[in-house]
Amino acid sequence: MLGWTLMFLVIAVIAGLFGFTGIAGAAAGIAKIIFFIFIVLLVISLVANAIRGKAPRA
């Protein structure tokens, strides 16, 4: 689950870079929303794994 979260976070960051630099100005709003959604999902995933006491998979 954490792997999926990190993968989508990377995709959102890349989309955000394109949006914030003006390459795809129309997608900037969507990229911002996706970026913050996946930041929240990453934090939730990290907290859930910490509470369960599981070590991250390599």
From Swiss-Prot:
Record's protein name: UPF0391 membrane protein Sfri_4000
One Pfam family in the UniProt entry: DUF1328
Membrane topology: Multi-pass membrane protein
Taxonomic lineage of the native organism: Bacteria, Pseudomonadati, Pseudomonadota, Gammaproteobacteria, Alteromonadales
Location in or out of the cell: Cell membrane
Keywords of the record: Cell membrane, Membrane, Transmembrane, Transmembrane helix
An example Gene Ontology CC term for this record: plasma membrane
Superkingdom of origin: Bacteria
Family to which this protein belongs: Belongs to the UPF0391 family.
Membrane-crossing segments per the record: 6-26, 27-47
InterPro entries referenced in this protein's UniProt entry, alphabetically: DUF1328
Species for this entry: Shewanella frigidimarina (strain NCIMB 400)
Disulphides: none
Principal location: membrane
Chain segments annotated as coiled-coil in the UniProt record: none
